[in-house]
Amino acid sequence: MSRYPDPNQVFPNEYGATCFLKNVITAPNITVGDYTYYDDAQTPTDFEKNNVLFNWPEFGDQLVIGKFCSIASGVQFLMGPANHRISSVSTYPFSVFGGTWAQKAPPHLDQLPRKGDIVVGNDVWLGRDSLILPGVTIGDGAIVAARSVVTRDVAPYTVVGGDPARFLKQRFDDELIQLLEEVRWWDLPPEELAELLPVLCDPDLKAVRRALTAVLARRAST
């Protein structure tokens, strides 16, 4: 048995409800970092089919999810093709039904409202049944409360919740957030990460601050 979880394994534990997400993704426009997991008691491996909605890669939008993210059951990402044309009199998608309708009203991607990519940082916790809309960027260390609808960007290490999701609080002070962003613990090799785990799980933020400062000092001296 390996000393550390294998990021290339679909099911990292014996429960079968949690999968390391990058290993079940096939769409060319979806990227998921190491150790990010999706938890679902039914079919966690069907994430791409059930949780990434209206994903048409030819549309050009990307879904990028960082490392060590915790994605709860029912979280969904609404991709750009979900948006209807709003610049014309009717918003109805006539062309998708084929035949004469498609000939008379051919689809024009440039007429659709383009919101851009969905980008989720590292160590982000997305609560159960939350919905992330097109064009949203969620920063490192952020938390999205259960059943929230995220319509706008979320700053690193903040907590948002509601429909639409609103700022609830900043998790830490600016200095500690800057330290975390500089250390970027999610990029450490497994051996170094294991040594840092007591710090990452310590509620004593003063001790955490000292430890992270020491990490940066050691890096600067090598």
Residue ranges and their predicted role:
Residues 144, 162:
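Conserved G/P- and acidic residue-centered "switch" motifs that form tight phosphate/ATP-binding loops
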Residues 148-150, 165:
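Short coil-to-beta-strand initiation/turn motif
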